[in-house]
């Protein structure tokens, strides 16, 4: 991403910051929206549209999902720094989140849940690690706007 000293089209910041803000907004909506509904989906009876597991198992799965998100930030940062670069990794993470949500919506039962949660979890963690790098790359280190962008 090119450094843009004179680009001030988004509240005094480069226009690319608007895109990143939107990506981050929808990723957080995805994460917290799923956190709020996931346990109900797992422990509601099959006849009610759920999977019919116990509340204890549902809580364990939700906790493991949350842990996966934050643990995968380490892997995502490594992939971004060493293999693909920040922008490609960010794009790949967004695609993983999308595929995870599609899996949760379209693949029935525990298989769809497992595939979907792994894809969304790894994608969300990777996206969290990479977004900050992309924001930092938009500014020169001496740019006064850099701190405000974060």
What are these model-predicted stretches?
Residues 17, 55-56, 141-150:
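Loop-to-transmembrane helix entry/capping segments in MFS-fold secondary transporters
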Residues 1-32:
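Cytosolic juxtamembrane N-terminal segment immediately preceding the first transmembrane helix
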Residues 126-140:
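Intracellular juxtamembrane helix-capping segments at the cytosolic ends
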Residues 82-94, 142-146:
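Cytoplasmic membrane-interface "Motif A"-like loop-to-helix N-cap segments
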Residues 36-59:
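Short amphipathic helix-loop junctions that connect adjacent transmembrane helices
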Residues 59-80, 128:
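Central cavity-lining transmembrane alpha-helices of secondary-active solute carriers
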Residues 25, 100, 111-127:
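Hydrophobic core of transmembrane alpha-helices in multi-pass small-molecule transporters
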Residues 92-113:
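C-terminal ends and interior cores of transmembrane alpha-helices
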